[in-house]
């Protein structure tokens, strides 16, 4: 929350059939609340009729992005807040009006945690990535069902194409699964084609692809999830968002261990798989991994985790700089170091 004082503090509890609108002003702690039918046009008129500066808050839901896009031009600021943090809403009786009243109190007190939203061109990329991941999950489920069916009929489970089965019902189910898997593969090719188009259009994706272990799909996922690297104050916040560090719990001068933050599982998967792909290659991530194992005595899993953090930091740096990662600089340094060492040995 910023330090700006607004004339109107507005909270909305939006549902399919109704919306509760609570409002406070900078001069009064009195809350006015109304509960009316859900209508975004009427809501825009309501906001337009309020004179002075306005800040609006609503909770992160499936319609939050749509409301953000529709209302952003009618207020000075919109805050999409994290409902997980709003524990106050769980106390006492619960109605839409009560929820809106509590939400506007949290807004005015500056106690809300904002969820990042934007109305730019990256919205299309985010929706495309979301659809792709849903498709992959559905495809994995279909292939697992096919494998389970074949194994239940005494087969290996890895057979391709049509397989002769004794039971007629099994043959029918197998043919249905084969058709669905074929459709899944075609849809997957369509998504990859769109990803290649996006890579040609957006330099941010090409910059991410220049990193070791980051291929096309993961580069698109990074850009779709991060959108703007400048929303992270430092690398520590980004590593926490990516789930690559744990947060320490200290009270009374005593440590009570560490806990995982609430993080993006998508980003964590991208950097973890990226490190696995980079290890064994001629790149700085593999150099760092080998250094940790040979010089620092790290276990392999700890070295992989540290390398994943290094890859995430490089990814954030590339995003902020707007430039392609250049491993040639590293090779030049290694060559100079090798030449220097050889010269020292000759002198000795």
Q: Language-model segments: what does each one mean?
A:
Residues 210, 216, 221-300:
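Phosphate-backbone recognition surface of nucleic-acid-processing proteins
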Residues 129-207:
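Glycine-rich, often acidic, oxyanion-interacting loops/wings at catalytic, nucleic-acid
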Residues 65, 98-101, 122, 126-129, ...:
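Non-catalytic, well-ordered alpha-helical scaffold segments
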Residues 1-165, 280, 296, 302:
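Phosphate- and other anionic-substrate recognition elements at nucleic-acid/protein interfaces
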Residues 110-113, 142, 228-231, 278-284, ...:
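Short helix-capping/linker segments at secondary-structure and domain boundaries
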Residues 70, 149, 270, 274, ...:
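Amphipathic alpha-helical segments in well-ordered regions
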Residues 252-253, 257, 289-348:
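Low-complexity, acidic/Ser/Thr- and charged residue-rich accessory regions of DNA metabolism proteins
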